[in-house]
């Protein structure tokens, strides 16, 4: 089987880390459970300058993100059973080294890491093998996807049989699912069970 797995807020607790940082930098104390927007600028009501400053801390923040419980164990089980796992992130490509190091530190050396411009941020270096151009991505096929962002659901429209396991987060609780192939999951244990416990 082939798995698409998003990075932030699926593998690691990025939203919680940015909530703590926004409180520290700007006194914007928004409880994690009240983060109703995927866009950090909207969640914390930041000015453009504050948003830029927040993102300026991204490299150091990314290095220390907590793993979402169970993520690496399930992914390594899939890989060890011969399944293909692609970590497909919407992060800027400038985070590649920090992102790859995080995966390696968490025992995910065999997981492929790709960058896809999911949110219109631009990724540059189009000739890099880790950057997926849209036409490259849309040629890929997957059996299951693990994703938290409703803004990324459009990247699954070309795969009518794809089972999408939506990792429950405050910003996706009011999102409508495009079809019956989407299922909300609250843990990696539940994701594993919904993926048929491959292995």
Question: Which residues fall in each region the model found?
Answer:
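Active-site neighborhood of HAD-like aspartate-dependent phosphohydrolases
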Residues: 1-53
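Residues at the starts of beta-strands that form the adenosine-phosphate
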Residues: 80, 84, 112, 163
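Substrate-recognition "cap/lid" segment bordering the active-site pocket of phosphatases
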Residues: 93-146, 150-157
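Structural recognition of alpha->loop->beta junctions
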Residues: 105-116, 141, 177-197
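Acidic, Mg2+-coordinating phosphoryl-transfer loop and its flanking beta/alpha structural elements
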Residues: 144-186
């Amino acid at each position: 089987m082939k798995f698409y797995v998003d990075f932030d807020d699926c593998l690691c607790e990025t939203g919680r880390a940015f909530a703590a940082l926004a409180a520290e930098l700007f006194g914007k104390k928004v409880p994690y459970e009240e983060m109703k927007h995927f866009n950090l600028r909207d969640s914390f009501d930041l000015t453009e300058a504050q948003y830029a400053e927040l993102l300026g801390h991204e490299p150091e923040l990314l290095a220390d993100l907590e793993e979402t419980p169970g993520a690496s164990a399930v992914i390594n089980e899939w890989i060890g059973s011969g399944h293909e796992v692609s970590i497909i992130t919407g992060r800027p490509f400038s985070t590649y080294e920090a992102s790859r190091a995080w995966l390696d530190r968490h025992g995910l050396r065999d997981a492929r890491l790709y960058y896809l411009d999911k949110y219109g941020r631009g990724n540059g270096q189009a000739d890099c093998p880790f950057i997926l151009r849209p036409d490259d991505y849309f040629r890929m096929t997957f059996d299951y996807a693990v994703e938290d962002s409703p803004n990324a659901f459009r990247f699954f429209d070309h795969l009518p049989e794809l089972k999408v396991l939506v990792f429950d987060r405050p910003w996706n609780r009011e999102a409508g699912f495009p079809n019956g192939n989407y299922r909300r999951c609250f843990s990696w244990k539940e994701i594993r069970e919904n993926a048929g416990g491959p292995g």
